[in-house]
């Protein structure tokens, strides 16, 4: 169970920054 929590946390730690960076990149591209 602990490994499941760790895996989920790791997934969020990776996905959230990627999502924020991707969103910022899209806004920049649309701005131009």
UniProtKB/Swiss-Prot annotation:
Signal peptide: none annotated. The keyword Electron transport applies. Its main location: membrane. It is a single-pass membrane protein. It comes from the Bacteria. GO terms for cellular component: cytochrome b6f complex; plasma membrane-derived thylakoid membrane. Disulfide bonds: none annotated. InterPro entries: PetM_cyt_b6/f_cplx_su7. Keywords: Electron transport, Membrane, Photosynthesis, Thylakoid, Transmembrane, Transmembrane helix, Transport. Pfam families: PetM. GO terms for biological process: photosynthesis. The chain crosses the membrane at residues 9-27. GO terms for molecular function: electron transfer activity. It is found in: Cellular thylakoid membrane. Belongs to the PetM family. The 4 large subunits of the cytochrome b6-f complex are cytochrome b6, subunit IV (17 kDa polypeptide, PetD), cytochrome f and the Rieske protein, while the 4 small subunits are PetG, PetL, PetM and PetN. The complex functions as a dimer. Component of the cytochrome b6-f complex, which mediates electron transfer between photosystem II (PSII) and photosystem I (PSI), cyclic electron flow around PSI, and state transitions. This is Cytochrome b6-f complex subunit 7. It comes from Synechococcus sp. (strain RCC307).
């Amino acid at each position: 169970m602990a490994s499941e929590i760790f895996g989920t946390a790791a997934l969020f730690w990776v996905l959230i920054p990627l999502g924020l960076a991707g969103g910022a990149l899209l806004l920049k591209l649309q701005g131009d």
